[in-house]
């Protein structure tokens, strides 16, 4: 994804 959070980073959200 575009954010910096661990979950979004990996593309889970």
From Swiss-Prot:
**BP GO annotations:** intracellular iron ion homeostasis
Q: Does the keyword Iron apply?
A: yes
A single GO molecular-function term is: metal ion binding
Q: What EC number(s) would the UniProt record show?
A: 1.16.3.1
Keywords (alphabetical) are:
Chloroplast, Iron, Iron storage, Membrane, Metal-binding, Oxidoreductase, Plastid, Plastid inner membrane
Please tell me what else the database record remarks about this protein. On the 2D-gel the determined pI of this protein is: 4.74, its MW is: 25.7 kDa.
The scientific name of the source species is Pisum sativum (Garden pea)
Q: Which reaction does it catalyse?
A: 4 Fe(2+) + O2 + 4 H(+) = 4 Fe(3+) + 2 H2O
Q: Which GO terms describe its cellular component?
A: chloroplast inner membrane
Q: What is its main location?
A: plastid
**Superkingdom of this protein's organism:** Eukaryota
Task: Say if the entry is tagged with keyword Plastid.
Answer: yes
Under the subunit heading, UniProt states: Oligomer of 24 subunits. There are two types of subunits: L (light) chain and H (heavy) chain. The major chain can be light or heavy, depending on the species and tissue type. The functional molecule forms a roughly spherical shell with a diameter of 12 nm and contains a central cavity into which the insoluble mineral iron core is deposited.
According to UniProt, the tissues expressing it are described as: Leaves.
Name assigned to this protein: Ferritin-2, chloroplastic
The compartments listed are:
Plastid, Chloroplast inner membrane
Job description of the protein: Stores iron in a soluble, non-toxic, readily available form. Important for iron homeostasis. Has ferroxidase activity. Iron is taken up in the ferrous form and deposited as ferric hydroxides after oxidation.
What family is reported? Answer: Belongs to the ferritin family.
């Amino acid at each position: 994804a575009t954010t910096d959070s661990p979950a979004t980073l990996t593309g889970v959200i």
